[in-house]
A protein has these predicted regions:
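Basic, Gly/Ser/Thr-rich N-terminal segments that form RNA-phosphate-binding interfaces in CRISPR RAMP
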Residues: 1-397
Length: 397
C-alpha cells in the first residue's frame, strides 16, 4: 500500500457541519470535505486543459450564458475519475476511486458556538447558534492507493493546490476553514507553489492530448470562445484579462486577515473605503456586486426586496480566499483566486432601496469581464486602505 501523509492545521474558524448543519462533526475535519475540494480542482485543471486545446466550448441555454454540454461533462468526469483516479459514477462505466483517504485529529477538539466569532459567520448563521472549531487544531490527512498509475502524482499535486487555495466547510470561499500544510511525508521534491501549479497544468494538458479521442473530446473548430462554460485553470485571456488568476498577498498576517475577509461584507467594505458603514462603492454604482456570487437577494423589514435576483437560484462566487501562516509549506498570506466563466444567468434583476426603480441587467461575456474589473480595482483599493497588499506573488498565469 502506497501512502502520503499530510499534517494540516486550521488557520481560521472551521464550520464543517454534521448530520444536522448547525452541529459540528466531533472529528473536526471530514473526509467528504477534502474529497469535495480535490474533485473540484481536478475538474478545473482538466477543464482548463480542454478549454486551451479548443475542446471545451459549452452551449447556451434560455437562462444561462454558457453551460458545458452533456458530452463535455462526461469527458471531464472520465478524465478526472479514470485517469486521475478520483472515481467515476456513470452508469455502466462506474469506477471506484483509486485513493482511500481518512483524517485523524491530532489534538483534543471541542465544538464551540461560533455565531459571534467573525462577522461573516454571524451573517451565514443569521445569528443563530452554530457549532465550529477555533483555529490551530491539527489533523493528519492520510491518502492511500494500492498500486501506482500514470497520473497519480498529478492528482496528488492537485490535492495540495486545493488545500492552498480553498478552505473547507461553511464560508470556505471566504477563507473560513483554511488549512496550513505543515508537513508532507514522504516529502515531494522541494518546489514553490508557482511551480506546483504549472506542473499540474502541464501534466493535465498532456493527459488531455493523450486521451482526447478515448473519451470523446471533440473540437468545435472554434478556438475563439470568449469564456469557458465553467471555472477552469486556463492560460487564456479574454479582453486582456486572465480567465484564471491566482495571487498571494504575502504581507497579510493573522491580525489582518479577518479585515481582508470582511471585504465581502458591504458595511465593512464601506468602513474601510469611505469611513462609513453606508456608501455607494464602485460595486454598487456599477451594479456589479452580483459578481461576488448569487443570490444576493434579501428582504428589508418592510419586506421590500433588495439586492440581485435571477431565475437561477444559486451561483457560487468565482472568487476564493484562503489564509495561511508561516507554518505552511508554501508560505503565508492571503491566497486569492478568481475565475472568469460563462455559467451566469443571462438576466439578473437589481433592486435598490425605496427611492430606486428595479433594473434588469443583461449578462454577457463583456459584462462578466467588466464586473471582474470593478471587483479587482475595488479589492486592491480596499487592501491599500488596510495598508496591506504591497507584497504580491503572481502564482498563475
Amino acid at each position: 500500500m502506497n501512502k502520503l501523509v499530510v499534517e494540516l492545521k486550521n488557520t481560521t474558524p472551521l464550520l464543517v457541519g454534521w448530520y444536522t448543519p448547525r452541529r459540528a462533526d466531533i472529528r473536526g475535519l471530514r473526509t467528504t470535505e477534502i474529497k469535495g475540494i480535490w474533485r473540484w480542482w481536478a475538474r478545473a485543471f482538466i477543464g482548463g486543459a480542454l478549454y486551451d486545446e479548443g475542446l471545451l466550448n459549452g452551449v447556451g441555454t434560455n437562462d444561462v450564458l454558457l453551460r458545458p454540454s452533456k458530452k463535455e461533462v462526461e469527458c471531464i468526469a472520465k478524465l478526472v475519475g479514470i485517469e486521475l483516479g478520483l472515481g467515476l459514477a456513470i452508469a455502466r462505466e462506474s469506477q471506484a476511486s483509486r485513493f482511500t483517504i481518512y483524517v485523524e485529529p491530532l489534538d483534543s477538539i471541542t465544538p464551540k458556538d461560533m455565531r459571534d466569532r467573525w462577522r461573516r459567520i454571524s451573517l451565514l448563521t443569521i445569528k443563530k447558534s452554530v457549532e465550529g472549531f477555533d483555529a490551530s487544531h491539527r489533523f493528519r490527512l492520510n491518502v492511500e492507493w494500492s498500486r501506482d498509475f500514470r497520473y497519480r502524482l498529478t492528482a496528488l499535486k492537485i490535492l495540495l493546490i486545493a488545500l492552498q487555495f480553498t478552505g473547507v466547510g461553511k464560508g470556505s470561499r471566504r477563507g473560513l476553514g483554511s488549512l496550513d500544510v505543515v508537513s508532507i511525508s514522504p516529502s515531494l521534491e522541494e518546489r514553490d507553489l508557482r511551480s506546483l501549479v504549472r506542473e499540474a497544468y502541464d501534466e493535465c494538458s498532456e493527459l488531455v492530448r493523450r486521451h482526447t479521442k478515448t473519451y470523446g473530446a471533440r473540437s468545435s473548430g472554434n478556438k475563439a470562445v470568449e469564456l469557458p462554460p465553467l471555472p477552469v485553470v486556463s492560460k487564456r485571456t479574454t479582453s486582456e484579462v486572465p480567465v484564471a488568476e491566482m495571487k498571494v498577498f504575502r504581507d497579510v498576517h493573522r491580525g489582518r486577515f479577518e479585515d481582508v475577509h470582511n471585504f465581502f461584507v458591504r458595511t465593512e467594505r464601506c468602513r474601510v473605503l469611505y469611513y462609513s458603514p453606508i456608501c455607494h462603492d464602485e460595486l454598487r454604482k456599477e451594479k456589479a456586486a452580483w459578481f461576488l456570487g448569487l443570490p444576493r437577494f434579501q428582504k428589508e423589514r418592510t419586506q421590500r426586496e433588495t439586492g440581485y435576483k435571477a431565475e437561477v437560484e444559486r451561483r457560487a462566487s468565482p472568487i476564493m480566499l484562503a489564509f495561511h501562516t508561516d507554518k505552511n509549506k508554501f508560505g503565508s498570506g492571503a491566497f486569492v483566486t478568481c475565475f472568469l466563466s460563462g455559467d451566469w444567468p443571462k438576466k439578473i434583476e437589481w433592486h435598490g432601496d425605496h427611492t430606486e426603480k428595479p433594473e434588469k441587467l443583461n449578462i454577457n461575456a463583456e459584462a462578466v469581464v467588466n464586473a471582474y474589473k470593478v471587483f479587482s480595482n475595488e479589492f486592491l483599493r480596499y487592501l491599500r486602505g488596510l495598508n496591506v497588499g504591497h507584497q504580491v506573488d503572481a502564482i498563475w498565469p
